[in-house]
Amino acid sequence: KLPALVSDNMVLQQATKVRLWGNATPNSSLKVRSSWDNTEYTAQVNDQGRWEIWVQTPSASFEKQQLTLENGQDKIVLHDLLIGEVWFGSGQSNMEMPLRGFWHCPIEGGNHAIATSGKYKNSIRYATIQRVGALEPKDYPVGGEWKVCDPRNAPEFGATAYFFATLLTEVLNVPVGIINCSWGGSTVEGWLPKDILLNYSDIDLSLAGNDEKIHPMLQPMIMYNGMLKPASKYTVRGFLWYQGESNV
């Protein structure tokens, strides 16, 4: 089993070691082979069935690649992978707002961006983590499948990160991957782990999970546990943070 972020169409950060992870038969071994250099890596699965491994990537390229994973019983081949620059976008509605806009809130130039998005089909990929809160850190994010950039998929791409990606791919001439992990109206407390929040006496941790008393977007730590932490294993170049209004 693999998280949705480790899937077909993903973009891997160039010229570094990237982390892959998942679940397999406990106390077994797993082999991973990369198409770009035909190197084989071996991961040991622990007694809880979890494994992770670091794989060396080459310089950025528009040439499509593959990763093959097998454990002697099952075989998974991940297709149409690109090597380039990967950025993680998070925050509240400014980061979440898609190219199609929200109700009565259109994106200036959004329709044109959607209609012409096909020109980035071989250079931009986009993954969106679903909005899920949790009281304890999760192993896998919900959602996160990588989408090719085209007029069918682009309407759901967060606009801020999309325009960042188009600029980046045009200036650097490399593939760009965006992971969008955002929740409109959220406060910064929701994106922080419990051990940090314990340092602040004005934050009431009992509000976490109490949907009857307070909206999930205003609850402490639940977005960190349900969205940010499980996606944080993915190797990226940098982090785009667009949040603040809910804390003013």
Can you say where each PLM-predicted feature lies in the sequence?
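Cell-envelope and extracellular/periplasmic
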Residues: K1-V248
